[in-house]
């Protein structure tokens, strides 16, 4: 449960600040600085996940696949560019999760949804 909450609150928060910087600033000129700070926070939080997976992986619960692995996969589809650096343990967890037979259709549906969002734009 700890990792699921971590992803939902700590990892997701800077993603929202980056994508919706205009919602978190009083002056339009501050949005880019906020995006940079969000990227810094995301990188720090992604690094904590990386360290955990290096120590305990390949999944969040070692050899046991779990819901936080799905959350990591989904988050990685739209936010990995926020992180600066290399994250091979995250990449491996994402690869393993994405290749699971029951996850494939879920991921395909998620990616179609991202495509629809991209075609209409991010709500302001």
Label each region the model flagged.
Residues 3-98:
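GST-like fold's C-terminal all-alpha helical module
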Residues 12, 102-105, 118-119:
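Residue-level signal for secondary-structure boundary elements
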Residues 29, 90, 102, 120-123:
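Juxtamembrane helix-loop transition sites at the ends of transmembrane segments
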Residues 96-112:
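Charged phosphate-binding loop/patch that engages nucleotide di/tri-phosphates or the phosphate backbone
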Residues 110-124:
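Acidic/histidine-enriched, glycine/proline-rich intrinsically disordered or flexible terminal extensions
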